[in-house]
């Protein structure tokens, strides 16, 4: 098995459960409870928790890669900006997905620019809090 495949499998086993759990909860809340129509503000904690989950996932990927020396010998100082940057990328991709759902299917997912920016902020805040917790725990 190639080292890259082993890394991918280890990363998925180690930490993919967190974003998958958040996504499944999100879908169940929509289908089962029509949650965002009933409580539009439910979107705010979901983006925060999503940021925590995706930072956890990228942190697990980073650690699995470091363990296999796929990143060389990364300095510990690189962990926070790399994970926060990847969390930011995931939040932006999610917002693009919401935009496409609205454009293609007519399902209102982004009421206005302020909502989109708050979603991005909450995702980044969730990621930053997880990174801070992880850093303090490992120090």
Model-derived features: where do they sit?
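Residue-level signature of transmembrane alpha-helical entry/exit and packing/kink sites
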Residues: 15, 44, 75-83, 115, ...
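Generic hydrophobic alpha-helical membrane-segment signal
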Residues: 14, 31, 35, 79, ...
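Internal alpha-helical transmembrane segments of multi-pass membrane proteins
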Residues: 66-88
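Alpha-helical transmembrane segments of multi-pass membrane proteins
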Residues: 22-30, 55-59, 86-98, 123, ...
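Interfacial helix-loop-helix junctions of multi-pass membrane proteins
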Residues: 33-43, 92-124, 128
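Membrane-interfacial alpha-helical segments at the cytosolic side of multi-pass membrane proteins
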Residues: 49-66, 103-108, 124-137
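"…centered on the first transmembrane helix and the immediately adjacent amphipathic helix/loop
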Residues: 1-60
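Short, flexible segments with low predicted structural confidence
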Residues: 16, 21, 71-72, 93
């Amino acid at each position: 098995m190639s080292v890259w495949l082993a890394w991918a499998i280890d990363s998925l086993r180690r930490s993919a459960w967190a974003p998958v759990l958040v996504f499944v909860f999100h879908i169940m809340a929509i289908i089962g409870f029509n949650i965002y129509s009933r409580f539009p503000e439910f979107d705010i904690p979901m983006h925060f928790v999503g940021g925590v989950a995706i930072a956890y996932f990228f942190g697990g990927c980073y650690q699995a890669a470091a363990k296999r020396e796929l990143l060389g010998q990364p300095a510990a100082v690189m962990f926070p900006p790399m994970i926060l940057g990847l969390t930011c990328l995931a939040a932006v991709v999610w917002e693009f997905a919401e935009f496409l759902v609205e454009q293609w299917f007519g399902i209102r997912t982004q009421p206005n620019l302020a909502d989109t920016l708050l979603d991005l902020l909450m995702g980044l805040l969730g990621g930053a809090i997880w990174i801070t917790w992880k850093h303090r725990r490992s120090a």
